[in-house]
């Protein structure tokens, strides 16, 4: 009988197979649930991926049997150290790789979280380690059934998916253009997205109504990290997780990881968000942006200068475009894209004014008009790609491009145009981005620079030996330098300057004012995840009608997007040419939403988004979020798309009670509403009667 080694406390008990070194049991001590439901699916504790120096091929190396396990105690912490001295080359009869590893697992006496590190020792002249998948778990689900399990996945601003064992195997996920499920030769379904960009944060969470599982990377070096999820599907139900680090370990070298965290809880995903935030608060700082930006609730997005050879507006039209946005919607912030040579998504990164749109003088004069009429301008710059048809592709594009392990460039296609991905950790490209952004602020009077794709598209490892990065996984550090130095430089030109990026990245948020957040309804998008974890970060949400939808579907989607932006306190992203296509009823709803957003802004400025915390019960069919207000008081925002009449909102009763409750809504109604004290078990609650006839979005202030 193989001996098991254990590590645990009152929260959990972890068991390690003494021969194979894999997790054999993982028990929640409060619920008694052993998360490991499929022993046959249980995998190794780690996997290595190495380059065969002779063939140049990438091979998978699996740990062979354990050579030693040490148990330790130091103060209030216990530990296990599991040592392996070699690795088996998967799928071959090759001699074992002389690559050893030691896994350390450490836990405090009264903490649901354990910390995991791995040390890799490469003594094999045949192989160079380039990827480390660790920690790695397989064979899990929670409770008696997997069908009520929920996964929280940090794809862009977040996903929340019920029953991923099933959903991740459907055509919906198999057919995604990014972050898609793939099926391996072994029949295993998997998703893997890299941090920081496609994955906005470095943690995942899995829970049901009694159990929780948290996996996070506490990597202060911010290496490119693949957040991997696996499942056997409904016919072989289990889930798996892993964190992949891209790092080179050559023969004779040793590499030790930063900690990863594994926690066994009885809580939902909010616990994971708070725990991750507690860690990262010691690593990053919150942004310090100009005060006037707190009053910006909407921006005028102008992608309508030149696209695919078609001219829609010229630089001389900027004053009238600005005036129209200001008059119709109160827009002061003019976001200018498609201004560069050949227009949107062409000839990047040639960020020079397109000659057919006008002269640099006309562009500068247009910006001056905006600035002199109480507005300000943000310019679009793509921070990622180089058009292969550019005149400079052979001389600069190929040199700056990222290279994979075979020396090939990473190619991406947008519309009819092909690009290569540039290496943000190569100093030449960094300097070009920094200087182009600075030039737009100095020469054209812009206050904002928007770096497209920076927090949205996937990071990759770069193997180009001629680049200035010290290792293959330094993608994120490159963009951090760009953001930090560009912000400092443009603030030196104009202290009111700021940066924006596409989508979200926790480490990038320290340097930006707004993240243009989008994902896709089919992705189980859940923007509340990023907003709750980082309530200080401003999200800019797309609030335009969808071109691919018509009729009722188009109307419902616009209502949903506007309502979500109101609940999250996001800045509205609206294009005048798109708003002009709205029917009268939808146009009226857009304007009503803008009015409500402006009325809510003083509350958002002194509030903190806490998602549904403190909400005990809500009427069916309604979505409710909670903002805690500085100085006392609570704001509850309710989206009621079906216009369900009445109902009761039950909330935790704040200390000191409630003096009174008022409401206002998207239709312009407002007034006092009734509430009464009640209880749920031992807890006191406030039962707030929702007014009949209220609008689709209802705001409740409890003082």
What residue spans do the PLM features occupy?
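Polysaccharide-binding surfaces and accessory modules of carbohydrate-active proteins
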Residues: 3-8, 12, 33-91, 106-224, ...
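Beta-strand-rich recognition/accessory modules
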Residues: 6-8, 179-292, 316, 552-553
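Carbohydrate-binding surface patches
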Residues: 195-207, 615-656, 697
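An acidic-aromatic substrate-binding cleft motif
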Residues: 264-345
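The substrate-binding groove and active-site-proximal loops of carbohydrate-active enzymes
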Residues: 296-316, 346-360, 414-434, 465-479, ...
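Active-site-adjacent "subsite" loops/lids of carbohydrate-active enzymes
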Residues: 309-315, 361-363, 367-368, 376-444, ...
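Glycan-recognition surfaces
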Residues: 392-419, 423-427, 477-584
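C-terminal beta-strand-rich structural cap/linker in extracellular carbohydrate-active enzymes
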Residues: 677-703
């Amino acid at each position: 009988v193989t001996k098991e080694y254990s590590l645990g406390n009152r929260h959990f008990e972890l068991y390690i197979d003494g021969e194979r070194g894999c997790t054999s049991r993982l028990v929640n001590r409060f619920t008694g649930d052993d998360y490991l439901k499929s022993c046959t699916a249980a995998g190794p504790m780690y996997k290595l991926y190495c380059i065969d120096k002779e063939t140049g091929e990438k091979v998978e190396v699996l740990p062979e049997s354990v050579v030693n396990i040490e148990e330790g105690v130091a103060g209030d912490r216990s530990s296990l150290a599991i040592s392996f001295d070699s690795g088996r080359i998967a799928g071959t009869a090759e001699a074992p790789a002389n690559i050893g590893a030691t896994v350390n697992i450490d836990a405090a006496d009264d903490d649901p979280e354990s910390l995991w590190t791995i040390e890799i020792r490469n003594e094999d002249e045949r192989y160079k380690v380039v990827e480390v998948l660790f920690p790695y778990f397989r064979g899990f689900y929670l409770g008696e059934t997997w069908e009520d399990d929920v996964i929280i996945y940090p794809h862009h601003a977040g996903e929340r998916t019920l029953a991923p064992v099933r959903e991740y195997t459907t055509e919906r996920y198999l057919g995604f253009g990014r972050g898609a499920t793939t099926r391996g030769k072994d029949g295993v379904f998997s998703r893997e997205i890299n941090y920081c960009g496609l994955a906005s944060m470095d943690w995942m969470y899995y829970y049901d109504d009694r159990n929780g599982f948290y996996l996070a990377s506490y990597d202060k070096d911010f290496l490119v990290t693949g957040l991997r999820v696996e499942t056997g599907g409904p016919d072989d139900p289990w889930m798996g997780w892993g964190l992949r680090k891209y790092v080179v370990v050559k023969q004779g070298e040793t590499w030790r990881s930063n900690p990863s965290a594994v926690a066994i809880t009885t809580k939902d995903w909010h616990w994971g968000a708070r725990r991750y935030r507690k860690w990262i608060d010691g690593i990053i700082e919150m942004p310090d942006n100009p005060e006037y930006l707190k009053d910006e609730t909407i921006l005028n997005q102008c992608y309508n200068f030149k696209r695919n050879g078609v001219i829609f507006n010229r630089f001389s039209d900027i004053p009238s475009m600005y005036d129209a946005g200001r008059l119709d919607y109160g827009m002061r912030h003019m976001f200018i894209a498609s201004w560069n040579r050949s227009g949107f998504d062409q000839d990047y990164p040639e960020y020079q004014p397109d000659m057919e749109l006008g002269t640099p003088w006309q562009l500068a004069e247009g910006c001056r008009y905006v600035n002199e009429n109480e507005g300000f301008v943000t310019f679009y710059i793509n921070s990622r790609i180089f058009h292969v048809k550019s005149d400079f592709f052979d001389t600069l594009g190929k040199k700056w491009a990222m290279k994979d392990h075979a020396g090939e460039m990473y190619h991406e296609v947008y519309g009819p145009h092909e690009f290569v991905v540039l290496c943000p950790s190569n100093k030449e490209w960094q300097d070009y981005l920094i200087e182009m952004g600075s030039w737009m602020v100095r020469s054209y009077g812009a206050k904002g620079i928007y770096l497209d794709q920076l927090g949205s598209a996937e990071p990759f490892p770069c193997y180009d030996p001629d680049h200035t990065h010290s290792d293959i996984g330094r993608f994120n550090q490159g963009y951090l330098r760009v953001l930090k130095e560009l912000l400092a430089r443009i603030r030196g030109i104009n202290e009111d300057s700021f940066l924006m990026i596409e989508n979200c990245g926790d480490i990038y948020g320290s340097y930006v004012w707004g993240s243009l957040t989008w994902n896709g309804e089919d992705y189980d998008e859940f923007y509340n995840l990023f907003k709750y974890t980082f309530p200080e970060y401003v999200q800019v949400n797309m609030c335009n009608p969808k071109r691919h939808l018509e009729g009722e579907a188009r109307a419902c989607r616009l209502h949903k997007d506007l309502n979500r932006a109101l609940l999250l306190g996001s800045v509205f992203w609206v294009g005048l040419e798109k708003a002009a296509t709205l029917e009268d009823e939808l146009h009226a709803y857009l304007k009503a939403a803008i009015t409500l957003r402006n009325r809510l802004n003083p509350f958002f400025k002194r509030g903190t988004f806490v998602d549904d915390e403190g909400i005990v019960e809500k009427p069916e069919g309604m979505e409710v979020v909670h903002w805690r207000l500085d100085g006392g008081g609570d704001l509850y925002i309710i989206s009621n798309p079906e216009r369900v009449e009445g109902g009761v909102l039950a909330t935790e009763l704040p200390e000191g009670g409630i003096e009174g409750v008022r409401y206002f809504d998207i239709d312009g109604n407002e007034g006092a509403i009734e509430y009464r004290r009640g209880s749920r078990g031992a807890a006191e609650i406030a039962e707030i009667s929702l007014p009949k006839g209220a609008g689709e979005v209802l705001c409740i202030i409890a003082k």
